[in-house]
């Protein structure tokens, strides 16, 4: 039924966490190839409003500023206090994380911009909304983690860093979690309020985790 999707050549879902919005919508990010070329990849949203009985795909995906021929992939989403969605995108070719926003529950997105304060390898990471003033906390805290070493033919990804933002993604600070080769990572808020980190450590991506 969708003339655009009829031309898609390949789709896979980003590994790791999805997100549930305050209105109940559950969503994951799809990585879409719209031609027979490897890149660019486009980040459309797969979402359900009925607990998974039916699924829809967003009309739009973020354009990628300064790197349109390579794009980005394996994005993750958090919901900001005003309902705006923030998408963090794995970069391809430009080693800075890309951020984009949506104000219509993920149906359309603005252009994703690279962030100089989020140096990033081309590797999957995660982002979570850790604490919100809407829930009685003293600060808004968004946490993200990913590898910071550029991923090239001669340099594997590594040196994962944990970053935090107190102003809903406007500015970021971070620190090194591990020195050396590393792969994908995922974050979770544990029952005691601490942050759980699941990460691939080493250059083979076969363990340990």
What are these regions (language model features)?
Residues 1-209:
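Asp-box/BNR beta-propeller blade signature and adjacent active/binding-site loops
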